[in-house]
C-alpha cells in the first residue's frame, strides 16, 4: 500500500496532477480508507491446530479499538470520514454489513478473515500491524469473549439500537484522550513513538 501510494503520487506529479490519499479529501464524497484484513490460526506445533482463534482476534481488536485510534487515524481529517460513506462510527462487528468497524466476509477455510475498516492512509502500517497483533494475542491469552454481532446497517439503525454501542472517538483529541486513559499504547509502543502520537 505504501509503495503503491508513492508510485501513484510520483506518476501523477510527472503528469501535472496531484493524487490525494488523505482520509477525506472532498467533504461531500467518500474518503480513502486503508482496510486491513486479519487472519489467525494456531500452527501444527502449538498442539491446538484446528481451533478457531479468529473470534478471539476480533474480540481483542474491538476491546482495544478506541485506544488504537490515534495511531490508526492520526490526522484531523481522519475523523471527518467516520460515520459516512461506509466508514464505521461504532465499535461493532458483523458478517453481513459494511457499516461495522469489523466485517467478516463470507470466505471460508484458509481465506477466512476479518476486515478492519477504520484505518486510513495517514496511518503507519507497521505500527498498525504491531498493535493489531498485540491486541489479538492479548485477547487469546485472556480469553476475551466476542460480543454479539450487530447485523444491521448502522447508518439507518434506530437510536435505541445505536445508543447501546460504544463509538469510535469523534476527533483526534478524543482519540488521544482514550489512548491516555488506557494502558495499551504503553504496552506495545516505545515511549518516543507514543509521545509523538499523543502530544
Residue ranges of model-derived segments:
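Helix-rich catalytic cores of soluble enzyme domains
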Residues: 1-26, 30-39
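Catalytic-core signal marking the mid-to-C-terminal active-site face
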Residues: 7-13, 17-20, 41-199
Amino acid at each position: 500500500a505504501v509503495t503503491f501510494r508513492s508510485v501513484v503520487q510520483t506518476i501523477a506529479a510527472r503528469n501535472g496532477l496531484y493524487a490525494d490519499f488523505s482520509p477525506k479529501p472532498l467533504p461531500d464524497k467518500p474518503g480513502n480508507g486503508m482496510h486491513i484484513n486479519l487472519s489467525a490460526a494456531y500452527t501444527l506445533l502449538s498442539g491446538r491446530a484446528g481451533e478457531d482463534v479468529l473470534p478471539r482476534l476480533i474480540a481483542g481488536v474491538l476491546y482495544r479499538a478506541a485506544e488504537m485510534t490515534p495511531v490508526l487515524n492520526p490526522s484531523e481529517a481522519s475523523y471527518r470520514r467516520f460515520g459516512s460513506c461506509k466508514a464505521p462510527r461504532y465499535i461493532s462487528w458483523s458478517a453481513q454489513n459494511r457499516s461495522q468497524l469489523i466485517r467478516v466476509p463470507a470466505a471460508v477455510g484458509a481465506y477466512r478473515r476479518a476486515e478492519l475498516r477504520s484505518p486510513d492512509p495517514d496511518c503507519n502500517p507497521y505500527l498498525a500491524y504491531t498493535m493489531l497483533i498485540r491486541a489479538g494475542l492479548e485477547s487469546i491469552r485472556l480469553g476475551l469473549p466476542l460480543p454479539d454481532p450487530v447485523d444491521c446497517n448502522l447508518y439507518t439503525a434506530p437510536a435505541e439500537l445505536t445508543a447501546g454501542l460504544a463509538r469510535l472517538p469523534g476527533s483526534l483529541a478524543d482519540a488521544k484522550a482514550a489512548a491516555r486513559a488506557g494502558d495499551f499504547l504503553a504496552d506495545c509502543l516505545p515511549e518516543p513513538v507514543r509521545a509523538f502520537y499523543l502530544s
